Amino acid sequence: MALDFRNPVAIITKNELVTRDIDVLSQLAAFDCAAVYLSITTLDANLARRLEPRASTPENRLHAVRALNEAGVPVGVLAAPIIPGLTDHEIPALLKAAKDAGAQFAGYQVLRLPHGLKDLFREWLETHVPTQAGKVLNRIREVRGGELNDTRFGARMKGEGVYAEQIKQMFTLARKQAGFSAGGPRLSIDHFRDPTDRQATLF
C-alpha cells in the first residue's frame, strides 16, 4: 500500500529480514519515500547473542546495510542502545564498520529502562557480566540523574550529565571521522498519490 500511494516510509530494525522487501523499498526510494535504519548495539557477536538472542547478528545487519545501499535505498545505522560502561567504547569502530558497509547516516540512543526492564536488566548483568554489573549500573545512573530511567522528553534518548556529554562528544567525533554528515534522510511527499475515492481503493 505504501508503494501504491507513494507514502513515505522510515524503518528502524535490528533484523536483516528487512532486505526481503528490498524491491519495494528501492521503488519507494526512487521517489524519496524510503529510508532504513539498522540498529546495532555492539559489534561483539558473543555479546550481541547474549543481549539480543532473537535479533540478527551484527555481521548480518551490516550485510543488510550493504545490500540496501547497493539497491539505492537510503540506509543508516543507529548505535542503539548504547549501554554506558559496556558498549559506549565501541562507538568509533561501529560507525566505521557501518560506513564501510555503505551506511549514509548515523544516530544514537542511550539505553532506556522503563518499568520492569530495570529489574530484568540488572538480572541480565549479574548473570552475563557480573564483574561489570556495578560499573554499568552506576554509569546509567550518571546519565539518568541518579536513577536507572528518565522519562522526560528531551532527556530520555540521550541522557544528561557529564558522562552523557562524553558519549555525545565521542559519537560526534566518530561520526565525523567515519565520514558521515550530521543530517539524516529527507523523505518527500511530493509524489504522494491522493486517491479520489479512499474507501474504494482499499479493496
Where do the language-model regions lie?
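Active-site glycine- and acidic-residue-rich loops that bind
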Residues: 12-19, 83-92
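Core AdoMet radical
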Residues: 1-65, 74-78, 105-107
